[in-house]
C-alpha cells in the first residue's frame, strides 16, 4: 500500500491498425518475451481468419466473445475465525475485461485442434462469440462457484 496516495493507472495506447484499446490489451496478453511484432501478427492474422470465416467485422466478433466470457461474479477467500470461506463478490469492470482477455488467450493456447496460434485464437474467439469454448466454460464455472457459496455473501468486505 503506497503512502503517497492511490496508484495511477497507466494509460494504454490503442493498437495501430484498429485504433482500439481492447485489441491493444489482447496483443499485450498474447505477447511473449516482449516480442510485440510477433504478437501483432498473431492477433491481426486471427482477425483476418475471423473476417474470412464469419464475414463480420472482427471487432464486433471480439466484442461479442468478450461479453460472453467476462465474469460478473467471482469468489475470494476470506478467513473468519479459523475457517476460510469462499465469499462471492462482484468483479470490477477493469478486472472483468482483463480476466476475459486472459481466459480467451489461455484457452486458445491450450487448444489441440489447430496448428498455428492465429488459428487457435481465431477459433477460440469465434467459439466464445457463439457461447461455446473453454473460456465460456471457465466463466460458467466461476459463476457456479459464486452461486454455490452465496450463503457466505454477507462476509463481503
UniProtKB/Swiss-Prot annotation:
GO terms for cellular component: small ribosomal subunit. Keywords: Ribonucleoprotein, Ribosomal protein, RNA-binding, rRNA-binding, tRNA-binding. One of its GO terms (molecular function) is structural constituent of ribosome. One of the primary rRNA binding proteins, it binds directly to 16S rRNA where it nucleates assembly of the head domain of the 30S subunit. Is located at the subunit interface close to the decoding center, probably blocks exit of the E-site tRNA. GO terms for biological process: translation. InterPro entries: Ribosomal_uS7, Ribosomal_uS7_bac/org-type, Ribosomal_uS7_CS, Ribosomal_uS7_dom, Ribosomal_uS7_dom_sf. Part of the 30S ribosomal subunit. Contacts proteins S9 and S11. SUPFAM superfamilies: Ribosomal protein S7. The gene is rpsG. This is Small ribosomal subunit protein uS7. Pfam families: Ribosomal_S7. CDD domains: uS7_Bacteria. Belongs to the universal ribosomal protein uS7 family.
